[in-house]
Amino acid sequence: MDRYAAAGDEAADRARQQERHYQLLSALQSLVKELPSSFQQRLSYTTLSDLALALLDGTVFEIVQGLLEIQHLTEKSLYNQRLRLQNEHRVLRQTLRQKHLEAQQSCRPHNLPVLQAAQQRELEAMEHRIREEQQAMDRKIVLELDRKVADQQSTLEKAGVAGFYVTTNPQELTLQMNLLELIRKLQQRSCQVGKAAL
């Protein structure tokens, strides 16, 4: 008798899973209509169905939320690093301007052209160094963000999310961003439905 009850429970679970899959797939198909037509064409029924299957247990929603939080923290940290560098450069410029002004005020008039030429060279050298430091910082930021994207792609691929794999192809990246946006919108909808049920 217990075997029959267990079989009935399994059948009911499968039916609930199938219903949930259908709801997710239907919601995804509805959301896809909001995307540009070029991306709508690339999101086949199979891709959307596979995505809906990956979303069934809610784990992918949690993974995406975690990745989003990590990304925001990373972006904030990188922004703060660049801001610190800009502030250091601002202080360097102010200090050099002050030093030059004091030197000019204490300089004899006949030596002023020589001093100003030397100061101009010093200023140009400092500006060159500042540009190089800013470019190095920008390259570091781009590399860090690229690394973060690859980590996200790898994590979502390992989680079995359709359409995700490590790539640098701009079209594929845009498609993956659209898929993430679909997942995020679905998550927001389910949160709103959950709140409405309360």
From Swiss-Prot:
Expressed in all the examined tissues with highest expression in testis. It comes from the Eukaryota. It holds the Pfam family DGCR6. Residues 78-142 form a coiled coil. Keywords: Coiled coil. The keyword Glycoprotein does not apply. May have a role in early embryogenesis. PANTHER family: DIGEORGE SYNDROME CRITICAL REGION 6 DGCR6 FAMILY MEMBER, PROTEIN DGCR6. Belongs to the gonadal family. This is Protein DGCR6. It comes from Mus musculus. The gene is Dgcr6.
